Amino acid sequence: MSDFAFKLYEYNVWANQQIFNRLKELPKEIYHQEIQSVFPSISHVLSHVYLSDLGWIEVFSGKTLSDALALAEQLKEQTEAKEIEEMEDLFLRLSERYILFLQQKEQLNKPLQIQNPSSGIMKTTVSELLPHVVNHGTYHRGNITAMLRQAGYASAPTDYGLYLFMTKTEKA
């Protein structure tokens, strides 16, 4: 796997943490507050992202997509009900699992055959799918930003350019 793909995943971890940091600054009830949006609440968005990320690492580790989807369905209500600090901890532990997995270079380009119940078999690799994991998180962080604005709050900046400036800018 290229350094870029790994750095992209590190960006994803950073961006998620920016969202958690911002949410913890706001009134506690905003996390579960119902908002007229794509998801009924911010807690539902973060649950969805977490369960999707969990599903992909399960698939990368050898589970079937059907098993990963079943696990997500089994954990859905439980994760939606968690408080922000509990979800932050779940995301942290999941990111540690990803990083340990991604450090196993031999796994990254091993062929995967993923059976999707509705669209057949996809032949791919972890390296090819990892940008999807990051892109999916980016998309839903945008949902959270829109939901926060709708509720009268600013979000946290999470764009990749800012991440690069924060991690690559030399101190004068």
From Swiss-Prot:
Hey, what's the signal peptide range on this chain?
A: none
Keywords of the record, alphabetical order, are: Metal-binding
A GO molecular function term, named singly, is:
metal ion binding
Binding residues for a divalent metal cation, per the UniProt record? H48, H136, H140
Q: Which family does it belong to?
A: Belongs to the DinB family.
Q: Which PANTHER family match?
A: PROTEIN DINB (PTHR37302:SF1), SLR1116 PROTEIN (PTHR37302)
* The name this protein goes by in its record: Protein DinB
